[in-house]
C-alpha cells in the first residue's frame, strides 16, 4: 500500500504530555489537554495548581531563529516586570523542543499561564491594558529583532497577492480592495516617519490574547506575530478589535477613551500616529486576510471560501474603512 506524505497533523495529547513530563520533570499526575488547533497547536498542561501552555508550531511556520528572538523578547519584557506569558526552560536548560511529527520536525515551547480569557471587560481594565501596552513599547522602542519587518509591502501588497488566489479580480469586493490598497499605500508613503515611533510590535493584542485573573491582573500572551515596525500598529489593531467586539457605540467609545488614556499615562501618542490609526487598522485587516489565505491548507480551509471573504470584506473591512477612514477624511 502506498504511503502518502502529510502536510499537517494533530499530535495526541497523551504522548505529548508524557514527553513534556519527562522534559520538564512534571509530576506523574500532570495532565495534558489539546486546547486549540489554529495557526499553531496549543496544549494545556496542568500539574497540581499550576497551568502551562505548550505551543507546538506548525511545520515551517517559524524557524529556530525566529522562535529564539520571540523568547529573547519575552524574557526582556519579563525582566522589566511587564506581565507577559513567558517561556520556560526544561530540565536540561533548553527552551525549544523538537517533536518528530508525521509531516516533519515541529518546534515547541512551554509558556507560563495565568488567568482566563474574557470577551468583554471593564473600562478600568482597558485603561490597564493601555498602560501595559505602553510599557511594552517603552522597552521595545528602537529595538529590532531578527524577524519580519511590517512594512506596507508586507501588510498590503503581499497579503493582497495571496487574496487573489481566492477571489476573482472582477468581483466588487476585489475591486474595492484594490482601490483601497492603492489609497492606503499612497497615504502611508506620505506619512511623516520622523513622528512615528519604531521598534518591536506584538501585532495581535486583543481579548483572545489576554488572560485576566479574578483580582483583575492582566497578562499578555501569544507573541507569535512579533516583529519590527511602527509601534502604533499595536494601537491600531487593538482599536480595530474593540470596534469588532463592542457593539454598543457609547460603551465602545468610553472603553476606547480609557484605553488611550491608559496608554498616554505612560507614553505619548503623536498626532501623526493618531492620524494613521484608522488607516493602519484597515491595513491590519489586509494583513490577517493574507495570513488566512497563506494558511489555507493547514488551518483556514474549514471556513475560508469566496462567500466568507465577501462577507468579511463587506461587513468588517469596508465598514471599518467607511466609519473611520472616510469619516476622518470628511472631518478634516
Residue ranges and their predicted role:
Residues 93, 104-120, 161-168, 288-302:
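A glycine-centered beta->alpha junction motif in the catalytic cores
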Residues 4, 288-332:
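ATP/Mg2+ or Mg2+-diphosphate-binding catalytic cores
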Residues 120-175, 198:
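A cross-family kinase active-site recognition segment
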